[in-house]
Amino acid sequence: MAKQPGLDFQSAKGGLGELKRRLLFVIGALIVFRIGSFIPIPGIDATVLAKLLEQQRGTIIEMFNMFSGGALSRASIFALGIMPYISASIIIQLLTVVHPALAEVKKEGEAGRRKISQYTRYGTLVLAIFQSIGIATGLPNMPGMQGLVMNPGFAFYFTAVVSLVTGTMFLMWLGEQITERGIGNGISIIIFAGIVAGLPPAVAHTIEQARQGDLHFLLLLLVAVLVFAVTFFVVFIERGQRRIVVNYAKRQQGRRVYAAQSTHLPLKVNMAGVIPAIFASSIILFPATIASWFGGGTGWNWLTTVSLYLQPGQPLYVLLYASAIIFFCFFYTALVFNPRETADNLKKSGAFVPGI
């Protein structure tokens, strides 16, 4: 029976409709994320907080604010961002390697993956509560920031903790919905949206500087070329892969005979993707932020020294950041690609690699 051309058109049309729905869902979710980043925690003076963030330019707090899409500078319910979830993911994935019970759960396939995801949610809740308590108790005690909290007390602490924890758990749920109903990894998309939220104002400010003559046009052109070149290089590396030739011998199943086939096993150059950089940022941000919040308290002056050493650009920060990225590159690649498991699967399917 001849294949009708109209069927291909209907199939393609249905595929485009599904893609459109997924894109619209992602756009809608990001709009909700941006709206939520403007909903403030009750009881905080936004003008005093803006002065605080102005004093913290170039510090770890500004970096934390960037990851939250500016939510921290507005004392938003999304101020914690998605970082507690990332930290919990790191802890759970490390435990799956060193803890035999979790290692067995991981081998259970889809059911095991759901259990691991559930454990990650519990870990996110615990870390979010811990971090929100730290922020709620640290804000009223920050030196030189009198009036930041209008009415400090139990009511403010309770409201702030509930708001921050709820915001983080909602972002985690939103990221999972984007992964399921949208396109790509939802958590990565939320992080990306938070980072690029400050891009349009920065571009507009740069163009205005060039228009007024404060910035030379050739320098602006050079920056644009560098941005394009870096983007091209990142995409080139991300799409790069090593193709291992895999052959299937002639085989018979029942009455059907399958001819010998040759295909390839694609191994990405960068299997870990951007995950190591995100994990490394999360690992450094957590202690540095705690040190920055509590460093001004009595008896906690040593935390101020720690926070200064962990500022972006400091030698210790660069060393720890680079070391963490290298570690998570190896660690995450070992998680997503198991050579022994891949070899067993190839053997079970009757495939072999020539010369091995």
Curated annotation (Swiss-Prot):
Gene3D superfamilies: SecY subunit domain (1.10.3370.10). The chain crosses the membrane at residues 24-44, 77-97, 125-145, 154-174, 183-203, 217-237, 274-294, 317-337. It holds the Pfam family SecY. Its main location: membrane. InterPro entries: SecY, SecY/SEC61-alpha, SecY_CS, SecY_dom_sf. It comes from the Bacteria. NCBIfam families: 3a0501s007 (TIGR00967). Component of the Sec protein translocase complex. Heterotrimer consisting of SecY, SecE and SecG subunits. The heterotrimers can form oligomers, although 1 heterotrimer is thought to be able to translocate proteins. Interacts with the ribosome. Interacts with SecDF, and other proteins may be involved. Interacts with SecA. The central subunit of the protein translocation channel SecYEG. Consists of two halves formed by TMs 1-5 and 6-10. These two domains form a lateral gate at the front which open onto the bilayer between TMs 2 and 7, and are clamped together by SecE at the back. The channel is closed by both a pore ring composed of hydrophobic SecY resides and a short helix (helix 2A) on the extracellular side of the membrane which forms a plug. The plug probably moves laterally to allow the channel to open. The ring and the pore may move independently. Belongs to the SecY/SEC61-alpha family. This is Protein translocase subunit SecY.
